[in-house]
Amino acid sequence: MTVLIPALTMAALGLAFGVGLAYALKIFGIEVDPAVALILSKLPGANCGACGKAGCAGFAEALKSHEVMPAACAVCEDETRVAIAEILGIEHKTKVKFIATLLCNGGSRAVDKFAYKGIKTCKAATLQFGGQKACEFGCLGFGDCVMGCPFGAISMGEDLLPIVDPNKCTACGICVDVCPKALFSLLPPDKKYYVKCKSTDIGAIVTKVCRPGCIACRKCEKACPTGAIKVENNLAWIYCAKCENMGKCLEVCPTKVIVRR
């Protein structure tokens, strides 16, 4: 009898709590829109936040209310975007693919101005006089981009520069946001040539702090037959809309800061 009473008491409490929870769910529960649930089932579930929403659930709700378009998800395959567009009853436009591209050619070849002993992150290093590199624009090499990429698309090379795997990169733009030096840019992969530098220092300074940097010699600008390259503010820029991948710029570049993808 002494065992039966506690057992019955616990059973009664369990029943009471169960009924209470069921009632609370009925009164306070939030019904999920079937369309949102269907859209969510199509999304990859990466919850990377690159779309600007609070994970895939937030993105699904934004899609249903037509705040965003399916193309805003960088992780989705094109067929997934088509399926979501059909659910929403809208026309889908194929998204042009981009790849995160590092615009720094320094790394281990760039001169250090002091021995950094602090926390091994680029963000922390930047707080100390802009980082240990003599080039104020250069990559610090601690891999904030590597840690920030949710798809494992970035690794550190032996030259202390990040390497982007084009097969894994979704162009989500997280590396663009986490790099304190703003050294990543999303570029179209069909444009094979780009200037791997962001320094706007004059050539004499660049030569002292980072020999493989852009010295604004204008040889590329003069050699380009389509006028796709302009040197502005001591830095060469390739305008993708005009570039026809001829490679003349790479041939004449004395520091080899223009590279082929």
Language model segments and positions:
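Glycan-recognition and catalytic cores of secretory/periplasmic carbohydrate-active enzymes
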Residues: 236
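Ferredoxin-type iron-sulfur electron-transfer modules and their immediate structural context
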Residues: 1-223, 227-230, 250-252, 256-260
